[in-house]
Regions:
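Catalytic "initiation/cleavage/transfer" segments centered on a nucleophilic residue
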Residues: 1-33, 111-185
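Signature for HUH/AEP ssDNA processing cores
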Residues: 26-97
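Short, solvent-exposed polar/charged micro-motifs at secondary-structure junctions
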Residues: 51-52, 103, 162-163
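Surface-exposed beta-strand edges and their flanking turn/coil or helix-capping segments
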Residues: 53-56, 106-108, 120
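Histidine-centered divalent-metal-coordination microenvironment in nucleic-acid enzymes
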Residues: 88-115
Length: 185
């Protein structure tokens, strides 16, 4: 798990490079994690003051990422203390760089942080926990904001029969993010 304060600079690409950026980020994530999970969702701002000022909007997104890292890190520690494995993860983020009152986003992470086949009856239970952590993180940053339209994607190299189909679904969902696309990890 990365340190809560550790953030790489936000990176944005021009329209012509968005597809390459998305494919590169997805490929790196699937190469890095045999059991990749991704959550696609929409952040809704309560006040449009955040969306009018690009610098303030970026700062708010960075606060959201930091809050999400911290909450997922704490969740991981609790799992380990309970005797359940929780593998380290690097959160990768894709989002619409020019958003208004909403921002479509995707978070990619190691499914092993919230689920282990030998210790958990369902991977979806762990994913639900991560989703609730994201909702809580956004509410901390934007108190009356909402996190909506959550879509779960699981791409597991450990299941080769379904891998190509699931990867294509994830790629298609990521390509739906409006241009220009930005990313962070």
């Amino acid at each position: 798990m990365n340190n809560c304060n550790e953030n790489e600079a936000l990176k944005t690409n021009s329209d012509g490079n968005n597809v390459m950026l998305i494919r590169r980020v997805l490929q790196q994530a699937t190469d890095h994690y045999p059991r990749l999970s991704a959550l696609g969702f929409t952040l809704q701002y309560a006040n449009c003051h955040s969306c009018d000022n690009e610098q303030q909007g970026n700062a708010q997104l960075l606060r959201f990422y930091a809050e999400a890292y911290c909450r997922i890190g704490e969740y991981s520690k609790i799992r380990i203390e309970a005797g359940k494995p929780s593998q380290p993860t690097l959160l990768r983020w894709l989002w619409e760089a020019e958003s208004t009152s909403t921002c479509r986003m995707m978070m990619l992470f190691n499914l092993g942080v919230c689920s282990h086949p030998r210790h958990d009856s369902s991977a979806m239970d762990g994913i639900q926990e991560v989703m609730s952590l994201l909702v809580a993180a956004w509410c901390e940053v934007e108190p009356n904001g909402e996190l909506t339209e959550i879509k779960v994607h699981r791409v597991e190299r450990t299941n080769p029969a379904a891998f190509d189909k699931r990867y294509a679904e994830l790629r298609d969902a990521a390509l739906q993010i409006a241009s220009p696309v930005a990313f962070a990890r």
